[in-house]
């Protein structure tokens, strides 16, 4: 069921071919949504045809807040809410040739759209353009600080994008948009189908959005990584028998690495009665050495030595909850059950 309320912004410009519809999705984002909508109005050098906010049954008054900013509002009432449902409702209602997708907890950089459109208009084979997303409050927690580096990708043609991205509406039409059955990984899955049509996904060296992760606890960290594991398993299974078995290698690597850390830690703990603390010491030394190696390889992402080391440790230990997420998907698939949305905020 979908309710649509249209409020046309006075800032909406002409109907030029390069005009853009902005689709923002959210659920109970509150002040973060206000900051997002305010940032859109600061966009430089681009014609914005409309701003559409798609709300997934918020209880905090987000739809009214969006209307106060002049956005068109679509409220969806899915039994099993997913980001894909909101994004599809938004782009199908939009009228511009280009669609900018934003999450409601992000802040748009004023120059991103101009840079992204330049790439789109210069190469018709580019179907999606995205830039750098960074955390707005890395100082708020060690999780924010470390996971901020997860957003850093090298510029160039890539396999997939994230949720903040500029896409061609025509290509969305050819692919039927996002898969609404996925609780996570819907952007990479769509990008795999887009690339199969001969289009390119481009990551540009340009600030795109600031993001408010709001991760303050280990429980949140665990659930986020578990959701990633679920996405790896479900998306890779869809393409496992194709010419391009997307994420198949990542899925196997996650299983091996996650299994290694679990089994090695268990073996070290079990052997304590016979060997004392030596096995645990060796396990810790191995983790530190591999974390330092990963930190050195990721030094191009910037940040200080301590954050890079923690990021290196994260790159290894996150494999454990990722493995659990993959196993949860496998179990549910065997039982014929669909997993509900895994939220960490």
Regions found by a protein language model. Name each.
Residues 77-94, 115, 159, 163:
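Glycine-rich, basic loop-to-helix element that forms the pyrophosphate-binding segment
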Residues 39, 55-63, 106:
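A conserved acidic beta->alpha catalytic loop
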Residues 99:
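Short aromatic/hydrophobic "clamp" motif used to bind/position activated sugar donors
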Residues 107-142, 212:
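Conserved donor NDP-sugar-binding/catalytic core segment of glycosyltransferases
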Residues 38-48:
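Short, acidic, metal-binding catalytic loop of nucleotide-sugar glycosyltransferases
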Residues 134-136, 150-173, 183, 189, ...:
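A recurrent flexible, glycine/aromatic-enriched loop bordering the glycosyltransferase active site
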Residues 258-331:
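Membrane-embedded multi-pass helical conduit in multi-pass membrane proteins
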Residues 181-182, 188-246:
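Catalytic donor/gating beta->alpha subdomain of glycosyltransferases that bind UDP-sugars
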């Amino acid at each position: 069921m979908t309710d649509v309320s249209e409020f046309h912004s006075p800032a909406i410009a002409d109907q030029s071919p390069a005009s853009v519809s902005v689709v923002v999705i959210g659920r109970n984002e509150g002040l973060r949504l206000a900051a997002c909508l305010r940032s859109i109005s600061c966009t430089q050098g681009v014609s914005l045809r409309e701003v559409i906010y798609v709300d997934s049954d918020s209880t905090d008054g987000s739809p009214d807040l969006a209307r106060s900013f002049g956005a068109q509002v679509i409220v969806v009432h899915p039994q099993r809410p997913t980001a894909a449902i909101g994004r599809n409702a938004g782009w199908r209602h939009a009228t511009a040739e280009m669609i900018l997708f934003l999450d409601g907890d992000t802040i748009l950089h004023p120059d991103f759209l101009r840079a992204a459109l330049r790439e789109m208009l210069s190469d018709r084979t580019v179907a999606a353009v995205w830039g750098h997303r960074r955390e707005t409050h890395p100082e708020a927690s060690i999780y924010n600080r470390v996971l901020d580096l997860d957003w850093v990708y090298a510029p160039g043609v890539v396999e997939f994008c994230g949720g903040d991205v500029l896409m061609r509406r025509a290509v969305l039409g050819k692919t039927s948009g996002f898969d609404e059955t996925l609780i996570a990984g819907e952007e990479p899955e769509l990008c795999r189908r887009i690339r199969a049509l001969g289009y390119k996904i481009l990551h540009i060296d340009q600030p795109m959005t600031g993001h408010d992760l709001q991760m303050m606890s280990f429980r949140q960290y665990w659930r986020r990584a578990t959701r990633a594991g679920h996405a790896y398993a479900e998306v890779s299974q869809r393409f496992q028998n194709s010419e391009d078995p997307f994420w198949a290698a990542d899925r196997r690597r996650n299983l091996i690495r996650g299994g290694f850390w679990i089994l090695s830690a268990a073996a070290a703990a079990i052997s304590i009665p016979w060997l004392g603390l030596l096995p645990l010491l060796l396990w810790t030394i191995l983790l530190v050495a591999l974390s330092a190696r990963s930190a050195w390889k990721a030094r191009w992402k910037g940040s200080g030595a301590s954050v890079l080391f923690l990021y290196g440790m994260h790159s290894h230990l996150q494999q454990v909850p990722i493995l659990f997420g993959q196993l949860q998907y496998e179990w549910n698939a065997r039982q014929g059950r669909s997993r509900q949305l895994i939220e960490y905020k």
